[in-house]
Amino acid sequence: MPLTEPVDAVQVEALSKRFAGVTAVDGLEFRVGPAEIFGLVGPDGAGKTTTLRMLAGVLPPDAGLARVAGCDVVREAEMLRNRISYMPQRFGLYEDLTVEENIRFYADLFGTGRAAREERAGRLLAASGMSEFRRRLAGQLSGGMKQKLGLTCALIHTPRVLLLDEPTTGVDPVSRRDFWRILYSLVDEGVTVVISTSYLDEAERCHRLALLRSGRLLLCDTPARLKGRLRGEVVVATSPRPRNVRDALARAPGVLGALLVGTAVHLNVDDAARIPELQRALAAAGVPCDSMLRVEATMEDLFVSVVGEAEGSGG
């Protein structure tokens, strides 16, 4: 039976947290619906981990309110722990125990019966391609397999809300794909997922996103609507000297922003028709350019644009 609830699975109002005079989370407000994958996106220091720890009830807020799975995270912390699962960046696997023994440990911790544990574990291990590794020591697993085992342990008691702190950092592409396939299957069961990530390409897999910077909420919407807010168009220039391209064009007429992405430069321009003009500007500056083409905007382009606007307005 689906676990969806008639009200928002997560409600956050004016949530704030300070450490030694530094504001880590500054007045956050957002809501997450039942059976939704909601992403907290931003660079290191954006407040993602602090927010998740407050939502999990392990870190008390200094101000504001948060309700998760129908529980006040401060006043009803004990009830909350039975309704959610929190998977921090370093999940507590026991490396001298096998995959099966780790799952059994967490099932016992949450009071999950044997029959329910075996049925749930069987489905989750099959979904993650780990059925044949039941008797392997956790310490002998790859990084991606450890994360998938951590997710299985976190889900063994069938939580209503799953909180994940950058679970795919350092994980190989195949394991990342498996991980997300499991998350989508959880949504089909009615589970709500709140996940933090610094991978902006991965963020596009979420149903909705909260873009964070320095503990503040910049924007919150679906990936498609967020990208639709980007002014102008995106042009990608490739060059053996990408930094010189960025520096030469950052303040050129019609250029709203310039971002280094590997060996390319993403230019946010008011009109892609400026490409010949920009190519002439590079030639005049003696900067080589192999190609310059209009492309579809990415979340990375949007984030850089939004941060630039915030800095320009003093935010």
Regions found by a protein language model. Name each.
Residues 56:
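Helix-to-loop junction immediately C-terminal to a conserved catalytic motif
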Residues 64-75, 79-80:
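Conserved ABC transporter NBD signature motif
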Residues 104, 108, 115-133:
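Conserved ABC ATPase "signature" region
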Residues 96, 137-144:
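Conserved ABC ATPase signature
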Residues 181-270:
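ABC transporter nucleotide-binding domain
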Residues 158:
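Conserved catalytic motifs of ABC-family nucleotide-binding domains
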Residues 162-165:
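Catalytic Walker B motif of ABC-type/P-loop ATPase nucleotide-binding domains
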